[in-house]
């Protein structure tokens, strides 16, 4: 079941639906058109007694919490979130699988790329400064930033950061935040912002700077995007559907990582030299093997 963002190309919903369909020919996708649809759509799903109901994104955390308690003999999966009760508290349920990700891993990889671009002064990267815009504080967002900072510093220890947090999802407002960071020297803007990503990335494009996306491949938004830190929603959903088909559904937290092929960085743009890509791939192999463990906690001073 999608959130209200619909099945637009490149969206979280579209990627998740593709993963489900790749794992089972009998998948039915139900689109939600507004947040007010969530609870009713989940109840209608329950009436059909499906083997598994997958809800996409944290937007449905409370609706899943309510519905799963009413239908404890049915199985649910909540993508990229944990059920949240009516008091706003995360809650584990015995019939809900929380499909989560190690955001610090893709954050680290794109951080390495950004750090090397600054170190080598590739193209417009001349100020040794990276910009970050986050929607707000939270475990996933903090992990993205922590990994990004660690990755960049692993190859460019003296690189500087400009970090801004915004509760606003207005693209125009986030564009202004990007303009401010660029005015302060930021060459590459890394967004973990949600719906206002397009505005922040536009700021990079207008200034002939660079941008890095998150969650899905955001190259479609602008030529300024040089890569994206990707959570492979399709892979996580496909593995969960396969697990149900094999009769081995497991409730609770499932954290997907590089070892599951559920983390990636998108194909870099032509601005990124091959030697930098090769170094990022080496870091990726080191994370997969356990030689490198990217941190999930933002360091002091960031």
Predicted regions span which residues?
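A residue-level marker of the well-folded mature domains of exported/periplasmic proteins
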Residues: 1-302
């Amino acid at each position: 079941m999608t959130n209200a963002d619909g099945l637009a190309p490149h969206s979280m919903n579209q990627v998740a639906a593709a993963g489900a369909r790749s794992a089972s020919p009998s998948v039915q996708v139900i689109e939600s058109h507004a947040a007010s649809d969530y609870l009713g759509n989940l109840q209608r799903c329950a009436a059909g007694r499906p083997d598994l109901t997958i809800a996409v994104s944290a937007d449905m955390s409370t609706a899943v919490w309510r519905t799963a308690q009413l239908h404890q003999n049915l199985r649910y999966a909540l993508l990229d979130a944990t059920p949240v009760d009516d008091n706003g508290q995360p809650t584990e349920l015995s019939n809900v699988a929380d499909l989560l990700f190690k955001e610090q891993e893709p954050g680290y990889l794109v951080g390495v790329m950004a750090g090397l671009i600054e170190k080598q002064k590739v193209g417009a990267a001349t100020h040794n400064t990276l910009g970050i815009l986050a929607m707000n504080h939270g475990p996933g967002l903090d992990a993205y930033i922590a990994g990004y900072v660690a990755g960049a510093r692993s190859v460019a220890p003296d690189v500087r950061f400009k970090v801004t947090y915004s509760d606003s999802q207005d693209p125009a407002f986030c564009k202004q935040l990007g303009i401010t960071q660029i005015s302060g020297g930021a060459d590459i803007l890394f967004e973990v912002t949600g719906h206002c990503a397009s505005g922040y990335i536009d700021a990079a494009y207008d200034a002939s700077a660079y941008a890095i996306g998150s969650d899905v491949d955001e190259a479609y938004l602008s030529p300024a995007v040089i890569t994206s830190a990707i959570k492979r929603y399709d892979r996580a959903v496909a593995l969960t559907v396969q697990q149900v088909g094999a009769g081995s559904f497991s409730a609770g937290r499932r954290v997907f990582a590089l070892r599951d092929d559920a983390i990636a960085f998108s194909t870099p743009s032509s601005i990124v030299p091959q030697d930098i890509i090769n170094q990022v791939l080496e870091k990726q192999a080191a994370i997969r093997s356990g030689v490198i463990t990217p941190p999930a906690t933002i360091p002091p001073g960031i």
